[in-house]
């Protein structure tokens, strides 16, 4: 999960004297939403492709006020980067070191491929969303309820949280689902959503939807 294992460096960082027209060609060639800009070896920020299209004759240095300032450190983890993809509506994130020097990038496709290997996304089985008052929330208890009913607990995400309650979506095996439901309700949980079919098309759809929910959270 360490970022350095997923860094690519074939996408160049551009200087402030590069024209927006040239930068746009780079973005299009790689099918990325942003290009990255440096000045004297120091990372400055990222510019959206749409901004380049609207300012083709300008140099990137003139577009500094329109830059998004996002990046991730070389020593970070994949999960540190997930939120950035959603927040900045990007499919590429620059990786820098502590001196703000460009080290390469991570692309959303690479992250999605890696996350899809996690049991939460890769295992067949049931998806179950439960709600519990925030003061009573315990991931340990949630896993114990599943396993005490001879179910397998493949993973869980906190998909919603506020001052009143926490909602947790979990991937569990298909065994003893009725007794798992009943136990959750007996312990004060509200069953928000159940998805127990394992038809391939619906399963892939559910994985995508919950990955998007995770990013939004």
Kindly give the residue locations of the regions a language model identified.
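Exposed loop/turn and edge beta-strand positions of beta-sandwich/beta-sheet ligand-binding modules
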Residues: 31, 89, 166
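Bateman/CBS regulatory modules and CBS-like beta-alpha motifs in cytosolic regions of diverse proteins
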Residues: 1-26, 36-39, 43-48, 53-86, ...
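Intrinsically disordered, low-complexity terminal regulatory regions
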Residues: 13, 18-29, 34, 203-211, ...
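Short acidic/polar active-site loop segments enriched in Thr and Asp
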Residues: 33, 91, 152
């Amino acid at each position: 999960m360490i970022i350095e294992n997923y860094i690519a460096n074939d996408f160049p960082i551009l200087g402030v004297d590069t024209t927006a027209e040239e930068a746009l060609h780079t973005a299009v060639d790689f099918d990325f939403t942003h290009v990255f800009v440096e000045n004297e070896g120091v990372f400055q920020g990222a510019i959206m492709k749409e901004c380049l299209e609207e300012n083709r004759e300008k140099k990137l240095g003139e577009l500094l006020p329109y830059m998004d300032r996002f990046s991730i450190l070389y020593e970070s983890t994949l999960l540190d980067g997930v939120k950035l993809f959603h927040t900045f509506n990007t499919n590429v994130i620059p990786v820098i070191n502590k001196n703000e020097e460009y080290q390469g990038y991570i692309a959303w496709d690479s992250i999605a491929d890696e996350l899809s290997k996690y049991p939460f996304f890769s295992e067949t089985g049931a998806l179950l969303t439960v709600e519990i008052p925030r003061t009573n929330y315990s991931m340990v208890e949630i896993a114990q309820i599943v396993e005490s009913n001879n179910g397998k607990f493949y993973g869980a995400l906190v998909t919603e949280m506020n001052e009143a309650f926490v909602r947790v979506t979990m991937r569990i095996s298909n065994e003893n689902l009725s007794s798992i439901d009943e136990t959750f309700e007996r312990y004060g949980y509200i069953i928000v959503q159940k998805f127990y079919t394992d038809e391939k098309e619906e399963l892939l759809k559910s994985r995508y939807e919950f990955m998007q929910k995770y990013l939004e959270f």
